[in-house]
UniProtKB/Swiss-Prot annotation:
Its main location: cytoplasm. Belongs to the SufE family. SUPFAM superfamilies: SufE/NifU. The active site is at 51 (cysteine persulfide intermediate). GO terms for biological process: iron-sulfur cluster assembly; sulfur compound metabolic process. Pathway: Cofactor biosynthesis; iron-sulfur cluster biosynthesis. The keyword Magnesium does not apply. InterPro entries: Cysteine_desulfuration_SufE, Fe-S_metab-assoc_dom. Signal peptide: none annotated. It comes from the Bacteria. Participates in cysteine desulfuration mediated by SufS. Cysteine desulfuration mobilizes sulfur from L-cysteine to yield L-alanine and constitutes an essential step in sulfur metabolism for biosynthesis of a variety of sulfur-containing biomolecules. Functions as a sulfur acceptor for SufS, by mediating the direct transfer of the sulfur atom from the S-sulfanylcysteine of SufS, an intermediate product of cysteine desulfuration process. It comes from Salmonella typhimurium (strain LT2 / SGSC1412 / ATCC 700720). GO terms for cellular component: cytoplasm. This is Cysteine desulfuration protein SufE.
Length: 138
């Protein structure tokens, strides 16, 4: 995930955007920076339900106990929102993910009020799925 910024830089970059059109473009750019998801990982086990778009998220624990997230979506904005979530959970253990609340970060970014209801629901579905899977790994 070297191409993605850390949490603080994400927030700085986001607040530097002049308007919501620029912010959406930045979110899309973040999604484009995600590593390609292996075709075999696009399976029902990794599908996130509750999203209008097709979304797949793969979670693996590395040798140091850190959770590594990979994902893909057929929608550019959703893939960008996925990248934002991955940035917020970067370098965390499964237990860290279970206890970390991403919502204050979304509030700092004023993200929730600028998403359509279906995108907000999809974002919540991604977060719930990641936290639920992390709970089984912790």
């Amino acid at each position: 995930m070297a191409a993605l910024p850390d949490k603080e830089k994400l927030l700085r970059n986001f607040t530097r955007c002049a308007n919501w059109e620029e912010k959406y473009l930045y979110i899309i750019e973040l999604g484009q920076r995600l590593a390609e998801l292996n075709p075999q990982d696009r399976n029902p086990q990794n599908t996130i339900h509750g999203c209008q778009s097709q979304v797949w998220i793969v979670m693996r624990r590395n040798a140091n106990g850190i959770i590594e997230l990979q994902g893909d979506s057929d929608a550019a904005i959703v893939k960008g929102l996925m990248a934002v979530v991955f940035i917020l959970y970067h370098q965390m253990t499964a237990q860290d993910i279970v206890h970390f609340d991403v919502r204050p970060w979304f509030e700092k970014m004023a993200l929730a009020q600028h998403l359509t209801p279906s995108r907000s629901q999809g974002l919540e579905a991604m977060i719930r799925a990641i936290r639920a899977k992390a709970a089984t790994l912790s």
